[in-house]
Amino acid sequence: MLSDEAKYRIQWALALAVIVAALRTGYILYERHEANAAFQARQQAKDVAYADADWYVSPKKLHPYDLKSAKQLIQQPVWVRAGYEFVYYSYNPSGRSVDFSHDAGLLGPLERLEIHDVMIVSSPKGRQVIAIFQKSAKTFAVPIAVQTSEDFHFYSDEMFFIEDPHDLYKHWPAEIWKSVDAHEVKVGMKELQADFAVGIGQPDGGSPGERTIHYPNGGKPLSVTYQGGKAVEITPGSSAK
């Protein structure tokens, strides 16, 4: 028959074994949780890195400051960065004159242009630098700089890409580029992708990726609501504000 002291020692040993087993089980579960959390963190980091890949795109710029440097635009095609933002006018090659009295149209989103010449002309707004291009067998001019005091303020770097956007943003999925080239906004697209598809819009306040933007879209207006950085609702026919 066991003595009381022996019983006490056995009970204490069993209790200690239970505690050790519980601690070991808890530690194993903790290790698994930490391993899973680390895996999830790595996956999120990959997702964020992919989502933020646009931040690492650095388009080349020409930084023109006079007529001679602006003629670099002739050396390669250009693509319109901000669709439906810049007015172009009819140009008479024989008379080397621009009809500033009538708008000929707006440059479309990612429209590809071949600039044939760059020159200084007089306009109702003072002297301007214009870029000459052809479209539908007609010749047009679009202002790329305005004279301020004795110098010209150039904004052509804000108007044009001088590299193919398809190469600059080649990390975008093929289905995204298919929609962009078709000038369509689809659920899941980012604001920049929508801008490339249908031009610049007017936001209803809010912060990028968490707001509604109204796009004139060259006379085919639509509104797009973004959440979490992606388009979640597209409403055709909504008037741009």
Residue ranges, per PLM feature:
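N-terminal Lys/Arg-rich, disordered targeting/topogenic segments
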Residues: M1-Y8
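SH3-family beta-barrel domains
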Residues: A38-S97, E158-F160
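Boundary regions of SH3-family modules and the immediately adjacent low-complexity/disordered segments
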Residues: F133-Y169
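Hydrophobic single-pass membrane-insertion segments
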Residues: T25-A37
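A cross-family detector of function-defining hotspots
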Residues: L29-R32, I120-G126, K170, A174-K241
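Conserved beta-strand/loop element in small beta-rich adapter and peptidoglycan-binding domains
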Residues: V98-V121
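Hydrophobic membrane-insertion alpha-helices, especially the h-region
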Residues: Q11-I28
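A short macromolecule-binding patch
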Residues: K71-L73, V78-W79, S136-T148, S223-Y226
